[in-house]
């Protein structure tokens, strides 16, 4: 069966749901696809279709990132439903990296919770530029004053992490009631879609820069070869173009023999799109998550760099104790962790939680990088710092 061509008519925007576990992120994702499919066409998705990876069933919490698509009046959205549970923050980092904007879901019954804060902080770290808030479960709160207090609390929390808390749209709704086809609550989902259209500007795609795609996953398709998936960070890739696989191992040249998006074939992939790229003559075991595909010669792998780092406070889920020269955490770049060691500046004996420091980092495996690349510092499965590459050394 030949695959249909993907129609590019409306501008394409990447969004995702973030927020505390059980506040209704997946229910909201289902409600959006159902309400908007009815209004603007598209395929509605049920809750359990979105909550669809095997681990999720066992624990009743979202682990993997689910992708859905929907149309609004003026745009086409690709939407990731991000994991809510603290154990899966690593996945959230990869999910949040794919957002032109995020929908922060906060249950009106609870108000902001620990993971609400953690996800806002992560959004700040991984560069989510815009947040729209959906205050969920408002059907369960009769007290208008309580709703206002929760709203104030959300705005203050956003401002604390340098988002414009006073300007951010907050929509009061009920995802479950909208799924149950209650017209009052359906309208709230439509309101949300209009706020997404109006508040999140169409991103300035870095389409003219050299092609770069951080690899998220690798598949082997019998008879066709190896496919890598990820979101194109910049530039474009056309079928037939030569590209390089960079980072972790030695740099290898290959050729793009196919581009797919949402199971439809494209002639080229563009910045901002989640795509699968078919690679000529590349074995499944030669490629891994954490590498990048890029235009030949446009980016190099490096292991040593100077960085500007913020070390999280204990209250933010960071370390409880200082660290010293030679500290060896994991450095999380784009889609993967790499172990590295830290060299502090002369005169800096130790780094306390809450400090902002310059440090030299030496990685055990090379990573494709430019100045300005952001990373998270992690240990024992939790984020303990956020940084940016200020100067590449080697």
From Swiss-Prot:
Binding site for Mg(2+): 26
Region (G2) location: 60-64
Residues binding GTP: 19-26, 81-85, 136-139
Location of region: G1: 19-26
Segments of this protein annotated with the region G5: 174-176
InterPro entries in alphabetical order: EF-Tu_GTP-bd, EF-Tu_GTPase, EFTu-like_2, EFTU_2, G_TR_CS, P-loop_NTPase, Small_GTP-bd, T_Tr_GTP-bd_dom
N-terminal signal peptide: none
Keyword Nucleotide-binding: yes
Localization (cell): Cytoplasm
Subunit composition and interactions: Monomer.
Protein known as: Elongation factor Tu
């Amino acid at each position: 069966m030949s695959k249909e061509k993907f129609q590019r008519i409306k501008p394409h925007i990447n969004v995702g749901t973030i927020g505390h576990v059980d506040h209704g992120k997946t229910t909201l994702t289902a409600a959006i696809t159902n309400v908007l499919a009815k209004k603007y066409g598209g395929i509605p998705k049920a809750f359990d279709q979105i909550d669809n990876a095997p681990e999720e069933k066992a624990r009743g919490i979202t682990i993997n990132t689910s992708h859905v698509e929907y149309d609004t009046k003026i745009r086409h959205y690709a939407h990731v439903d991000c994991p809510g549970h603290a154990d899966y923050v690593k996945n959230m980092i990869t999910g949040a990296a794919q957002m032109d904007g995020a929908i922060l879901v906060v249950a009106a019954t609870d108000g902001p919770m620990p993971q609400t804060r953690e996800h806002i902080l992560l959004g700040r770290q991984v560069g989510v530029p815009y947040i729209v808030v959906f205050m969920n479960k408002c059907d369960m709160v009769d007290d208008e004053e309580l709703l206002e207090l929760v709203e104030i609390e959300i705005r203050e929390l956003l401002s604390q992490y340098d988002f414009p808390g006073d300007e951010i749209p907050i929509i009061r709704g009920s995802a479950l009631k909208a799924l149950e086809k209650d017209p009052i609550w359906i309208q709230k989902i439509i309101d949300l879609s209009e706020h997404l259209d109006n508040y999140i500007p169409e991103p300035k795609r870095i389409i003219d820069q050299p092609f770069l795609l951080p690899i998220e996953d690798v598949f082997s398709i019998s008879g066709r070869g190896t496919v890598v998936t990820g979101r194109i960070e910049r530039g474009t890739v056309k079928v037939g173009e030569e590209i390089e696989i960079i980072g972790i191992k030695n740099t290898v040249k290959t050729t793009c023999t196919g581009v797919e998006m949402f199971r439809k074939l494209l002639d080229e992939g563009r910045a901002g799109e989640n795509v699968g790229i078919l690679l000529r003559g590349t074995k499944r075991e030669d490629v891994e998550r954490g590498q990048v595909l890029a235009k030949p010669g446009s980016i190099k792998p490096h292991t040593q760099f100077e960085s500007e780092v913020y070390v999280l406070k204990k209250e933010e889920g960071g370390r409880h104790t200082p660290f010293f020269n030679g500290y060896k955490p994991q450095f999380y770049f784009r889609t993967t962790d790499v172990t590295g060691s830290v060299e502090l500046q002369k005169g800096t004996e130790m780094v306390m939680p809450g400090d902002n420091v310059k440090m030299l980092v030496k990685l055990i495996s090379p990573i494709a990088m430019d100045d300005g690349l952001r990373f998270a510092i992690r240990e024992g499965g939790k984020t303990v710092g956020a940084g940016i590459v200020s100067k590449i050394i080697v």
